[in-house]
Amino acid sequence: MAAEPSKTGPSRSAYQRMGRKSQHWGAADIQCTRCGRRVSRASGHHCELQCGHAFCELCLLMTEECTTIVCPDCEVATAVNTRQGCYAMAGYVKEDSVMEKRQPKTIKNCSQDFKKTADQLTTGLERSASTHRTVLNSSSVMLDTNTAEEIDEALTTAHHNFEQLSIAGKALEHMQKQTIEERERVTEVVEKQFDQLLAFFDSRKKKYNNKKGLSCYDTYPPLEKKKVDMSVVTNEAPPPPLQPETNDVHLEAKIFQPQKDVVATASSKTIAVLPQMGSSPDVIIEEIIEDNMETCSTDDLGETPRYPKKPLQKNSSVPFGSKAGSAELVFVSHVIDPCHFYIRKYSQIKDAKVLEKKVNEFCNRSSHLDPSDILELGARIFVNSIKNGMWCRGTITELIPIEGKNTRKPCSPTRLFVHEVALIQIFMVDFGNSEVLIVTGVVDTHVRPEHSAKQHIALNDLCLILRKSEPYIEGLLKDIQPLAQPCSLKDIVPQNSNEGWEEEAKVEFLKMVNNKAVSMKVFREEDGVLIVDLQKPPPNKISSDMPVSLRDALVFMELAKFKSQSLRSHFEKNTTLHYHPPILPKEMTDVSVTVCHINSPGDFYLQLIEGLDFLFLLKTIEEFYKNEAGENLEILCPVQDQVCVAKFEDGIWYRAKVIGLPGHQEVEVKYVDFGNTAKITIKDVRKIKDEFLTAPEKAIKCKLAYIEPYKRTMQWSKEAKEKFEDKAQDKFMTCSIIKILEDNVLLVELFDSLGVPEMTTTSINDQLVKEGLASYEIGYILKDNSQKHIEVWDPSPEEIISNEVHNLNPVSAKSLPNENFQSLYNKELPVHICNVISPEKIYVQWLLTENLLNSLEEKMIAAYENSKWEPVKWENDMHCAVKIQDKNQWRRGQIIRMVTDTLVEVLLYDVGVELVVNVDCLRKLQENLKTMGRLSLECSLVDIRPAGGSDKWTATACDCLSLYLTGAVATIILQVDSEENNTTWPLPVKIFCRDEKGERVDVSKYLIKKGLALRERRINKLDNSHSLSEKSLEVPLEQEDSVVTNCIKTNFDPDKKTADIISEQKVSEFQEEILEPRTARGYKPPAIPNMKVFEATVSCVGDDGTIFVVPKLSEFELIKMTNEIQSNLKCLGLLEPYFWKKGEACAVRGSDTLWYRGKVMEVVGGAVRVQYLDHGFTEKIPQCHLYPILLYPDIPQFCIPCQLHNTTPVGNVWQPDAIEVLQQLLSKREVDIHIMELPKNPWEKLSIHLYFDGMSLSYFMAYYKYCTSEHTEEMLKEKPRSDHDRKYEEEQWEIRFEELLSSETDTPLLPPYLSSSLPSPGELCAVQVKHVVSPNEVYICLDSIETCNHSNQHSDTDDSGVSGESESESLDEALQRVNKKVEALPPLTDFRTEMPCLAEYDDGLWYRAKIVSIKEFNPLSILVQFVDYGSTAKLTLNRLCQIPPHLMRYPARAIKVLLAGFKPPLRDLGETRIPYCPKWSMEALWAMIDCLQGKQLYAVSMAPAPEQIVTLYDEEQHPVHMPLVEMGLADKDE
């Protein structure tokens, strides 16, 4: 028995060793150098070698026999004691190691039942050991006596022990499986609980779906994140990004609580809080904070935490706020202005309190700053905030030393000792405000106003309220990002943009948001600033008097306005849709109009009387907006000049434009098609569809000409307005366009009739004067009513060039005599833009001259207010005083030119305005008023040129620049000319101004960006340089004998050779030269031969009757030049976008793919109407077939425009039928030209007599009543014949009388065809429709005739086989017989109207026909009608022949009839009309053909000849025209 303790020693020792391993879990371990496995230093399962390396048993593979170990790394041998005894329990050690691995997991994480089972297992093992003490003791005795029996008994006991251990291992495996199943069961229960909570959350969420982005989303994240947190059960911390924001502290507590509390914590805390998700955020946050206060122990600040904690702020890695459009609750922490304020997230209250507690603990425990401590710009610091009443985190934003001024220079230090600081400014990163700390003793004058405006305090020692940050507190707070987020209200600006935000706006802003939780809707983020709107939170969250929208409230209170209301620059206006301007009639023309709106005789609107397109547009707009709900087209925030559709007081929608924003949900609109205005509510305004924008405005603003208010009063009297309305309102009138004023205002004279013949017209202008309601303007001369218009001739090219040169000269070298511009070059000079004409003509005033201008105006008024007009002989460049009637002002001016005896064009050189005034408005300028220099400068933008390839600025560019600059204050920089030292005029400048954003804009770059200008390329000017046309495309003739005399007569020498063609130019050089813009020069006028009579070829006849001829002597030169043009223009590339202008010379590629010289006549959309200079005819072609280049400018135009001398067309203009005759008669024909009168202008028409084949053209046209001539007798005389003419006649016109007896010239005199007759009226007969002219005009054939013709076909041959003519032979048989021998029939020689003949149809057969008219003369073509079918065709002579007489006995089958029962519709919307019968549409014609084709028809005659009217019926006795009536293509005619 005494030996028993010794026997149990090994077993007890083994279990004690197992227990020690469990107790030392977490003590220092030894890591294997090779495999990295860690083992306990106390376990003894390792070996530390003498070389310093440590290895585990597995890596060394030691046995008891080993006495030395060689290190696997450094191969150093180490002696080992093989009797350490640690190897005897190898088996137990292995089992123990397995359990050791399991123990931390299973025991720490399993349930309480599992722990109990493990304890029972340990007790059982101990009992098993005690049971076998005797055996073990026996085994030890056996070892001492070396008896075999004891050895056997010991082996039996060991075997039994191993069986017990095997049973215990199986029990452990069973327990582990149960643990896994229990964990899965618990997970399933928790997931079901979360599903229930999610369903509860969704129901609450749907209830308040209008605020689905509130902070509850951030406070309680989605379920998926919480499911991941079940990893706590396995002791694996979830990844930080997936941890929910509100449960951070709970997770920390779960991880480090004892294992017995794990399940209890999950059930008591988490489940208790989650059902309150739908409740107020205040309740949720308070519960979380109460739970966390204990966790955040104050001791944590003074010592290193025992366990590594995860950061409290889990959303720091996520950007602030939700997605665009979401909403959440926030506090406004600081307001600078409505576009600059800071907010704090409502869901971050917990973080804010934690942050406050930690910062207060740190600042209260830490020591004060030392005067030798260093402060650095941008460094983090803690400050005891005055405004916030607590210690706050801050960033140093400004440091000013004591010895320096209160302005930090760029080179001043950014690091200062505390005792050197005079002023420090700190930005509170968690609140958004800045505070200024000023050390006592700093002079007040050094403190800037912005410092005083900010929260500031004066103190003796900065160290008292500042604490410097330390690394460990930074580590604790590094994950709590700054809580203040900068924000700006979306799309609002101050009510007065120039003055900025008023203090009242900030005050009202604070009243609405201060100390309130508001809902913030995020739109987007710009440069770290959230663009938001602050709104009223849901009613169930927080009761508040916050408005529904804060920005709407500020706008409503007129403290702000929407940004769209402030964008008034032309840049923004260009992005707004606009109507096309109204189409204006030409000056000095008469048009039919209706007066649609009248404000006064000087301000009214009219519409041109056109087609029905405008009425159709009004109807379409009315139907669309009447049936449209309007929700998608509502205008919530109208903008000035916005196009729209507005409802009028009659309830109908019309096109309109916003012209005023009076407020109170009202807008003022102008109805652009009528001219009237109205103030309506915003509900009666709709957005306009694009399809309604295409039509131009219909209302044209006008002013009555020649008259002004009675007795020169400033305004029209009420009686004058009423009388004018009574005479003109909504009436059709004739309007005479006198002049087109600025802004497209027409100066007109109205007449009270539409120009009805034989009806006297009355001028409304004169009527108002006669009735004493108006007066004639000063200087107006009563005109003779018989001569209403005065002919105005276009100036000659010489006059135009002279005027252009005159206008380009500076007004006067004395414009600014006292200005030294050399000293102002390259300096920024402030100016006021007073007038903009084009980018190369801008008038500016120095800002300093404003007082001078006002003083000058006062002097002018005092000098000329009561002055009387005196006759003065005005001349160019004279100085004068000008009265501006509209503004009742007097200005200094200088006469530019005398327009007429009573009208003068003057330059108001103090404001840069040019205008035409009556001489009554001029006075002599007093000498004392000339002493002051001119107050405006004429400038020109540099480094730009017009876009589109033109050398002239487009009206669009001028209007854009004028709208953008006129009246603006800008900065100019005078540009120095590198080549010339003297001052050029206009002054070359660059102009800079501010846009609506306050950014500096270069006006030249602005025009380039708009596509209205191109950057000017600077090219070195060489004296010997030439343009491309002068270098490679001009092939001038020799100059000795080819001199133009007085621009009229030219000697042509056919033997003269042209100059040598210059060498070929490279394609690249050619294209580079072409693409450079150049001034378009004109071609020389046509050279008229210096002979009285010359031969010529008619190239074409113009649409106005102008005859273009090319002299025979010039044809060779024309062909030669044409060939050379083709060889020189083979390598032209694609043309860049080019702006064509009227009269510009160009190269034209014709339909024959050849190049010709041309001139632009008109630009029509994407096409250009051009004239071929050397051939005369015009054509409309695409712009891609033109090239802006001069071809041989030294060679005159070859074709000469001519007109018949003393010949007056009927109606004073050549009618279309007369022009058609001229074109057919003369085109490509050789004629004789007799020059009667040379033109005064070389470009005008040459007056001639033209003879073709010896006949005078004037006589020919007068004979056929196309014109009248004053010299008919002279023209009847035989034209002078030369020897050449006589020879020509003898060769060409020699006719023998024998030919007159030939059978070919014998044309029988035939009677007209017999007519077929219809049955008596009321009788029904079967008919066939042979030809349809229009829906109610057809040719029919009686069906009985057709049947008879086919039934009577039989052979009429005699016994000899020769056919004969039988009385019973049908027409078809006779025509078949004639078609077999048609070659033998004589040709037709008589072409009089109604002449019977045979004509060949398209099927190659010949049919009976008659001549209708001659359609063309060269070549001759005849219009014929097939009498048996009614159809017509235009045929040449080879398809006509004489008709055999026996075919004349058959009556014409086709009968022309008019169909009764229907008529053209009053309203037919079909666009395509029948050209020869426009009252019917093509759709109606095709529908009628469908009704007639392939049907058996019957006709009932309604009226006898000559105009036969029938009604057609189908087989069912229904009128055939009823489908047309049902389709709306015809109206029933009762």
UniProtKB/Swiss-Prot annotation:
Complexes and interactors: Interacts with MXD1, MXD3, MXD4, MXI1 and PIWIL1. Self-associates.
**SMART domains given in the database record:** TUDOR
- In this chain, the RING-type zinc fingers fall at 32-75
In Swiss-Prot or TrEMBL terms, this protein is called: RING finger protein 17
Q: Name one GO molecular function term.
A: zinc ion binding
GO CC field: cytoplasm; nucleus
Entry's SUPFAM superfamilies? Staphylococcal nuclease, Tudor/PWWP/MBT
* SS bond partners: none
The answer on whether this UniProt entry bears the keyword Repeat reads yes
Q: What is known about what this protein does?
A: Seems to be involved in regulation of transcriptional activity of MYC. In vitro, inhibits DNA-binding activity of Mad-MAX heterodimers. Can recruit Mad transcriptional repressors (MXD1, MXD3, MXD4 and MXI1) to the cytoplasm. May be involved in spermiogenesis.
